[in-house]
Amino acid sequence: MIDVNKFESMQIGLASPDKIRSWSYGEVKKPETINYRTLKPERDGLFDERIFGPTKDWECACGKYKRIRYKGIVCDRCGVEVTRSKVRRERMGHIELAAPVTHIWYFKGIPSRMGLVLDMSPRSLEEIIYFASYVVIDPGDTPMEKKQLLTEREYREKREEYGQTFNAKMGAEAIKELLQDVELDKEVAELKEDLKSAQGQKRTRAIRRLDILDAFKESGNDPAWMVMDTIPVIPPDLRPMVQLEGGRFATSDLNDLYRRVINRNNRLKRLLDLNAPSIIVQNEKRMLQEAVDALIDNGRRGRPVTGPGNRPLKSLSHMLKGKQGRFRQNLLGKRVDYSGRSVIDVGPWLKFYQCGVPREMALELFKPFVMRELVKRDMASNIKNARRKIDRQDDDVWDVLEDVIKERPVLLNRAPTLHRLGIQAFEPVLVDGKSIRLHPLVCEAYNADFDGDQMAIHVPLSDEAMAEARMLMLAAHHILAPKDGKPIVTPSQDVVLGNYYLTMEQKGREGEGMIFKDTNEVLMALQNGYVHLHSRIGIATNSFTDKPFTDDQKQKIMVTSVGKAIFNEIMPKDFPYLNEPTQDNIVNGVPDKYFIDKGEDINDYLEDAPLIDPFKKGFLSDIIAQVFKVYKVQRTSDLLDDMKTLGYTQSTNSGLTVGIADITNLKEKPEIVEAAHKKVATVSKQFRRGLITDEERHDRVIQIWNDAKDDIQQKLVDSFDPNNPISMMSDSGARGNISNFTQLAGMRGLMAAPNGGMMEVPVISNFREGLSVMEMFMSTHGARKGMTDTALKTADSGYLTRRLVDVAQDVIVREEDCGTDRGLVVSAIREGNEMIEPLYDRLVGRFTMKDVLDPKSGEVLVKRNTLMDEDTAQMIVDAGVESVTIRSVFTCNTKHGVCQKCYGRNMATGEQVEVGEAVGTVAAQSIGEPGTQLTMRNFHTGGVAGGEDITQGLPRVQEIFEARNPKGEAVITEVTGEITAIDENPAEHTREITVKGETDTRTYSVPYASSVAVAEGDHINRGERLTGGSIDPKQLIKVRDVMATENYLLSEVQKVYRMQGVDIGDKHVEVMVRQMLRKIRVMDPGDTNILPGTLLDIADFKEKNTQAIISGGIPATGRPVLLGITKASLETNSFLSAASFQETTRVLTDASIRGKNDPLIGLKENVIIGKIIPAGTGMATYRHEEPKSVGTVSDSVYSISDIEKQMKAKDGQQGDTDKK
């Protein structure tokens, strides 16, 4: 076998008959498979050992030669070579066909490749191939045309008329002769001539033909090879036949399909030998053709061949297609050894980098290592005994196991793996029981809970794999989420509740006003019962030697609470003391107002001082973010562990529970409900009198009940007791929110109706009182709709992620700096008056392209090519800067990827991105993972005048990325200028908007219903909206330029996600949008050898043009094309990646005709052939191999001087040759 890591690229082409024979080890002549008595393969059959190799290792069929010493000998009795039986997985056979047969992929695909080459319609081809019509191959001296079709009757008449002077045939033989007659060079030249004058339909057809003919010409494939004289038989172990209990056999469908081909082929041979009548022979040839069609792609033409129980047989094409096909089932997702799965359970005692593995599971996973260690320690005499010992689970194996798993990380994965944090590495700790124990803080990254979730565990085997798991994948390193750079391991639920309880303050608790010299004294007082956790006390500030207090504060006494003193013990020594939950306290230390002079009466101070809020979930998150920023990963993960332990301990001590008495009764509720009923009655009366329409009545009733519910909710909030456990849980952010509480103690309110609106009758009861049967029934619809929506959304979101990953998988950070001179001007994204994404968010972690100047003084705030961190970004925003030019993925010049400078900071680490980072995949996951949080619904404005139905949520994201025409499309202007008139045209039910530009004036007619977004006298730029709605990006790219389109798509995606409260870094969306715009459609080829209408990568287009200019020719012109992500995935340069995505047969058909070469640049194609992926540690630069040129700095667009130099050099060379 060839070493897969050695080859650079992979090419595919059409196989010639000679090629097929050269692969083959012999011809399969008989349809037999196995002798059912001896279970030995039959001679010349589909499993013949002489052709495909022995069924047992080192043993010939008759048993004359056994054992390895006869390796390579061919047995003189049975003719079988003595070798390994696994050659039966790689040796092919062939079938010599008695008549040529067309390959269905090339005849039936859309467009029909054969039809294009021959310039014939697929209909007429079908008639010829399946023996319905004759085709004239050589008209001789008759008035017939070449390629003219004749029916059986016409053929007989012509034969009578002209005799043997012309040549007409039917079937694949005829097609083969026609294909052999095609003169590629001549046809290509003629078509190129025609193109100069052709227009419309004719031109399109010519371009398509030229494309195919040119592909044949360039690739060296012969069109006649689309017709086969011989077909390959795949190795028998890839179409196995196994015996089931009860003596029956299960066999792969392919064997049935091959059998039919062989049977029909043998029958045809016999008929030809017997000189049978032509009609019988024709029928047999047609059946052979159909059998081969079924073998290659069953069901593509006519009814599929079925097996027992009317089940269509799986042909060769089906083996590749779809989720169960070879690509997705076996090449992109393999099952691996040394893995297990089990239910997960919480392990609160674990450290952040640990997980609990059940003893038995660990013993099985690490079995070989334990066996080796047992032998090494002389606890077992040999490997066999060691295995027995392990299977018996002797007592002394457990100690060995303990030693073996030290320093060996394992990987834990939870399906669905929506982003890269779905697989993380941990150090195993042996636990009792059968469940895997998971650290509670990593649950959020995995989206795991302990209600029966299962997780899979994998053991990295090689040293490199272990090192990577430990260095790159250890859970303790993954504190920030890749999608937005915010901490993902924030405490939740019990931990939040415990820390909230710990940091509460209460007036007048025991020991209030005591003053201590340091924290140890406080702890002693607490243990001895002198103070309570919530007591407010004083501590001498100078006892905190490392904390950053001001000199003034150090002389004083700090007023704090016992709980906060305990909480601050877990913080880093020199981190500011946390006394109030504000960002100011985190960054600048405790405010002066919490200090009293020594000797001042603390009780007077406490009398007036308000209680400080306890620390809630959001504040804990801010603390973690700040600690990460200052102290980096290691210290943060220690802090998280301490915070977890503290939180669990305190929530246990607090004894917080929920009882029915905690749900209070609201006294004002009956009055509010009564008042609402009266209002509803009034509205109904107005409707009956005809003062308002039914729609208005409905809207008002809904409004009345919503107001009543809000009123009750507000009253509940006002009457809250801060010590009520339910209110503590919801206030701290541990669980539940105000609307849950309203449903328990207030009223449930209005319910969704099946038609998508609201029911007018509200649910007045709450859960404390209990619902009536009627109310319960009304609630069910909304509840069920919620469940079904979630299920549908998950599938949609998963499919979106798959398409995103596919289109961006080859975007990798390839170099440090691409040297581009362009940048992206960013400012805050707004929608009307609403801020969608502030400028600050768009600057953090990006490089500046130009100097940033202070708008007031004009001085340089930030130099160009600087990485902006949080502080720099804040400074720029505070200075009042409105827009900044940054380095962006949009303007990066790196081929097949991006450079460090254009990408900026890696969100997941907070550092500059490293060369080799697979930023495309990360971007796709970051956009896809929150997909499940987006809504499914398309918002309708409910018939309010002047509003369009706009799509939002997941459907809108799909609409943007698939570049579809949006629902509720806006009309945009093609000229820049002033709006001179907006006239109504009642006859047409439209409005006419006139835009007067500098050179021309345009009038746009827009429907009455749509809202006009402009007024007379407004100045408007081309590409801006005249009406409400979404712009069609394909229109925008025509009217404006690529940059404007990219910006529009970026802000539209951000709108959808930010509306739902999901933050995603701009750069992720930029990576995706750039992939949609990486192609150019060539309009005029100039002097290049590109065909008009071809789609080319921008980089390849520039390269071809550079060559044309150097050789003194005219460059090609093209226009940028916006492709949806599905289309963009299928248009990628890698046929392997495209074939494994969708439309497998179409992609492979096209690739083989063009003789495509897959340069193996992306991740997917390398996974498919089993090569190490060229990202991360797999990049050539990191693997001590010759780096490919891809890793070097790519040339930006050639400058004129470069080109002149090259031309000079060329002239010089020519001069030299002249001299010679």
UniProtKB/Swiss-Prot annotation:
Binding-site residues, Mg(2+): 449, 451, 453
GO terms classed as biological process: DNA-templated transcription
Domain of life: Bacteria
Pfam families linked to this entry: RNA_pol_Rpb1_1, RNA_pol_Rpb1_2, RNA_pol_Rpb1_3, RNA_pol_Rpb1_4, RNA_pol_Rpb1_5
EC number: 2.7.7.6
InterPro entries: DNA-dir_RpoC_beta_prime, DNA-dir_RpoC_beta_prime_bact, RNA_pol_asu, RNA_pol_N, RNA_pol_Rpb1_1, RNA_pol_Rpb1_3, RNA_pol_Rpb1_3_sf, RNA_pol_Rpb1_4
Zinc keyword on record: yes
Free-text cofactor note: Binds 1 Mg(2+) ion per subunit. Binds 2 Zn(2+) ions per subunit.
Cofactor(s) for this UniProt protein: Mg(2+); Zn(2+)
MF GO annotations: DNA binding; DNA-directed RNA polymerase activity; magnesium ion binding; zinc ion binding
GO cellular component, as recorded: DNA-directed RNA polymerase complex
Binding site for Zn(2+) 1: 60, 62, 75, 78
Catalytic activity: RNA(n) + a ribonucleoside 5'-triphosphate = RNA(n+1) + diphosphate
Gene3D superfamilies: 1.10.132.30, 1.10.150.390, 1.10.1790.20, 1.10.40.90, 2.40.40.20, 2.40.50.100, RNA polymerase II, clamp domain, RNA polymerase Rpb1, domain 3
Family: Belongs to the RNA polymerase beta' chain family.
Subunit field text: The RNAP catalytic core consists of 2 alpha, 1 beta, 1 beta' and 1 omega subunit. When a sigma factor is associated with the core the holoenzyme is formed, which can initiate transcription.
Its biological purpose: DNA-dependent RNA polymerase catalyzes the transcription of DNA into RNA using the four ribonucleoside triphosphates as substrates.
NCBIfam families hit by this protein: rpoC_TIGR (TIGR02386)
Name of the protein described by the UniProt record: DNA-directed RNA polymerase subunit beta'
Originating organism: Lacticaseibacillus paracasei (strain ATCC 334 / BCRC 17002 / CCUG 31169 / CIP 107868 / KCTC 3260 / NRRL B-441)
Organism lineage: Bacteria, Bacillati, Bacillota, Bacilli, Lactobacillales
